[in-house]
Amino acid sequence: MKKIGMIGVGNMGGAILRGMIASGYVAAEDVMACLHSEEKRQALAAEIPGLTCTTDAKALAQECRMIVLAVKPQVLGELLDSIKGEINDRALVSIAAGWTMDMLTSKVAGTTATLLRVMPNTPALVGAGMTAICRQATLSAADLAYAQGIFDAIGETAVIDEKLFDGFIAVSGSSPAYIFMLIEAMADAAVREGIRRPDAVKMAAQAVLGSAKMVLETGKHPGQLKDEVCSPAGTTIEAVAMLEKRGFRAAVQDAMAVCAEKSRQMSK
């Protein structure tokens, strides 16, 4: 029996698959992937030696102990119906947005499958993701730890209560879009000052990357790090004062609030 099965190898599924193999967390020989076309199956098998590839989801469910469901939300229900007879004693890991634990539990009712709901974000595509994990109460500690290791291979993970998922989506799932807007705005301003566009984008992106790294590695409060950049009567405090005047903090918090509320509505 294979250790891990992956149904769906699109952008996110592919990042998870390649990340866990490239990191050495699991050997390609211990993984099976299911793709929707023979052409894609052949291409992936050629790309990753030792990986077993199929177009038959039922066959994968029969062969794999833990199954990552990386298909689009609108087809997950049909997929679960099709493999329901094969998932007894399997641990299912869903990354489908909007599918709550109650919805997943209802779909696998009558089986002994156990469940995890997982929410990665797009920086996982470059190995710098942040993934939230919610476990079903009946899931074993060993299965939780093993699943967490899969997503640790593409960034960082946090095991949280499902009631916090809407907040997680606001602060991490959707937030790359806010940060991209910030980088774009910073680059535009730099171009106005005469800096070439490619250089401006690189400078802005590196500033965000370096600042995030300082928060994570120094352990200092972001406010303290901000204060350390602001010299008395200097350039930075002028910029900070303008951001405060324009309601920068409130805009970010309001954006996150509507994001979380939209997530709650979508899960009903």
Short names for language-model regions:
Residues 1-55, 62, 191-193:
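NAD(P)+-binding Rossmann beta1-loop-alpha1 motif at the extreme N-terminus of oxidoreductases
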Residues 31, 41, 60, 196-203, ...:
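Small-residue helix-packing motif on alpha-helices
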Residues 103, 107-114, 130-167, 180-217:
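Internal alpha-helical scaffold of NAD(P)-dependent oxidoreductase catalytic cores
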Residues 205-268:
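NAD(P)-dependent Rossmann-like dehydrogenase/reductase catalytic/cofactor-binding core
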Residues 32, 38, 48, 56-133, ...:
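Rossmann-like NAD(P)(H) cofactor-binding subdomain of soluble oxidoreductases
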Residues 52-57, 158-160:
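Short acidic-hydrophobic, aromatic-tinged amphipathic segments that line or gate anion-handling sites
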Residues 4, 116, 165-170, 222-227:
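Short pre-catalytic strand/loop immediately N-terminal to key active-site residues, enriched for Gly-Thr
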